[in-house]
Regions:
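N-terminal presequence-like segments and the immediate start of the first folded domain
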Residues: 1-74, 78-91, 98-155
Length: 155
């Protein structure tokens, strides 16, 4: 499309109140599993999820990048759901990748598409880094979610 107007996209679930926008004059990011813009309306509860790495509950960290990404996404889902939110409430991700490459981008993009589908996903920034907190840690993903408040609910 060559229109200059922003193109709102349907939300990932019928319950999501967020507006996902991929302006047609920008690169279409959906193949990489993210959206350019997510608009969330107040009143809402904000949820900030700390960076989730590829370690399991016992602290074991696999060597393979794809295994770490899969575990990090599983950890992220568990953390988001523990707050009472769901993946459809996530509006922003930051992904840190050690030794970033096109091959690693493909793994991350595939994991994001698997979690959010081919249509809509949160806004996302991927940052290549030289090192993360733990020896052998290759990926870390943090999230911000916005959960609309029911009428009369408190933040």
């Amino acid at each position: 499309m060559h229109s200059s107007a922003a193109m709102p996209l349907p939300s990932p679930s019928s319950a999501s109140p967020h507006l996902f926008v991929n302006p047609p004059r920008l690169y279409d990011p959906r193949a990489n599993g993210y959206s350019h813009v997510v608009v969330a309306e107040a009143p809402a509860r904000l949820v900030y999820v700390a960076g989730q790495g590829g370690e399991d509950r016992d602290g074991a960290l696999p060597d393979a990048f794809d295994a770490q990404v899969a575990q990090a996404m599983s950890n992220l889902r568990m953390a988001v759901e523990a707050s009472g939110a769901g993946l459809g409430d996530v509006v922003k991700l930051t992904v840190l990748v050690v030794d970033h490459s096109q091959a690693r981008l493909a793994v991350v993009s595939g994991a994001l598409r698997a979690a959010w589908g081919d249509g809509l996903a949160p806004a996302c920034t991927l940052i290549p880094v030289p090192r993360l907190a733990l020896d052998g840690m290759l990926v870390e993903i943090d999230a911000t979610a916005v959960v609309p408040l029911a009428d009369g609910a408190r933040a």
